[in-house]
Amino acid sequence: MTTSLTWHDVLADEKQQPYFLNTLKTVAEERQSGITIYPPQKDVFNAFRFTELGDVKVVILGQDPYHGPGQAHGLAFSVRPGVAIPPSLLNMYKELEATIPGFTRPTHGYLESWARQGVLLLNTVLTVRAGQAHSHASLGWETFTDKVIALINEHCEGVVFLLWGSHAQKKGAIIDRQRHCVLKAPHPSPLSAHRGFFGSNHFVQTNQWLADRGEAPIDWMPVLPAESE
């Protein structure tokens, strides 16, 4: 937290860079040619819409958007209400159940309530072709999200970065560990969760860090919008 700058303030120049314009152009051309791209165009930048720069308390780095029908909506690890909870998110819920008193596993995987509390759910690549994992990995999104991480590192103070898996850990190598809290573990995927994601206690450590700084902890129980009104 601690900056009055907005995403628009710090990203306006980046969004005019040729590589970024080319990324948007390529995605738009693929959509126009009839290729199904996830998430829908209106949702591509939802991570920034739901969590303003000055509100960022926690960053959870994902990699690729989900590439199945109706899943991706612009927030890493999250899926729309009514969509089956993906395996990695299910393992995140298992870790929460094991470590956060009173947490009960939700029946949905919609994490907007995390985002609105200051948890930036950032995929490092923001689009994907239907059914083709990593199909947009080389389009330029990685350059853009590297810049996003650098800007959070520069302009915010005391942010918790949850870096799960080698991809996220490489991406987060630039973070100033004197000013921010960096927590590393294997990815929550079923392939690696048992190698140290389970038992990492990251959700508890995150809230302890925030409490030590006098900030409100994250309520990790995901709430659907209608339930929170």
Swiss-Prot record:
Active site residues per record: D64 (proton acceptor)
SMART domains per the UniProt record, alphabetical: UDG, UreE_C
CDD domains the UniProt entry points to: UDG-F1-like
Record EC number: 3.2.2.27
Catalytic activity field: Hydrolyzes single-stranded DNA or mismatched double-stranded DNA and polynucleotides, releasing free uracil
GO biological process, one term: base-excision repair, AP site formation via deaminated base removal
A Pfam match: UDG
Family as reported in the entry's similarity comment: Belongs to the uracil-DNA glycosylase (UDG) superfamily. UNG family.
Protein's job: Excises uracil residues from the DNA which can arise as a result of misincorporation of dUMP residues by DNA polymerase or due to deamination of cytosine.
Name this protein carries in UniProt: Uracil-DNA glycosylase
Phylogenetic classification of the source organism: Bacteria, Pseudomonadati, Pseudomonadota, Gammaproteobacteria, Enterobacterales
